Design a protein with these regions (language model features):
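A short linear hydrophobic-aromatic micro-motif
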Residues: 36-43, 78-79
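Short, well-ordered beta-strand segments in beta-rich or mixed alpha/beta enzyme
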Residues: 5-9, 43-66
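Short S/T/G/P-rich N-terminal loop/turn motif that feeds into the first structured element of a domain
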Residues: 1-34, 38, 83-84, 88-107
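An amphipathic, aromatic/His-enriched active-site/gating alpha helix that lines ligand/cofactor pockets
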Residues: 57-87
Length: 107
């Protein structure tokens, strides 16, 4: 399945909910799984985002629906990004012409 990065910021009552009910984060992970996605790993962050979640989802539509669903609760703001493994990215660059300059020379 494709990999996605979700950057989450608690808003509204989100911080209070996490403070009084820390296991809520694990409950959300179960909800993510229920829609066909898989949480690969999660980190609590310092800075402009509170959490980074790496997840796998069947397709863009599924992860977009998940993102909107979670954000609609009013406790979190989410930025979702598709992630491409670097090996796949490099392979794709080597296999196609680049902006009209012809194929990349193999070293």
């Amino acid at each position: 399945m494709p990999t996605y990065i979700m950057l989450s910021t608690l808003v509204g009552d989100g911080s209070q909910t996490m403070h009084s009910h820390p296991d809520r984060l694990l409950e959300v992970d179960k909800e993510v799984q229920a829609v066909g996605c898989k949480v690969v790993t999660q980190y609590a962050l310092l800075g402009m985002y509170d959490f980074l979640t790496v997840l796998e989802a069947p397709d863009n539509e599924t992860v977009a629906h998940l993102s909107v669903d979670l954000a609609s609760r009013g406790t979190v703001k989410i930025l979702t990004l598709p992630a491409i493994p670097v090996d796949s990215f490099v392979s794709k660059l080597k296999s196609h012409e680049q902006l009209g300059r012809g194929p990349v020379d193999a070293d």
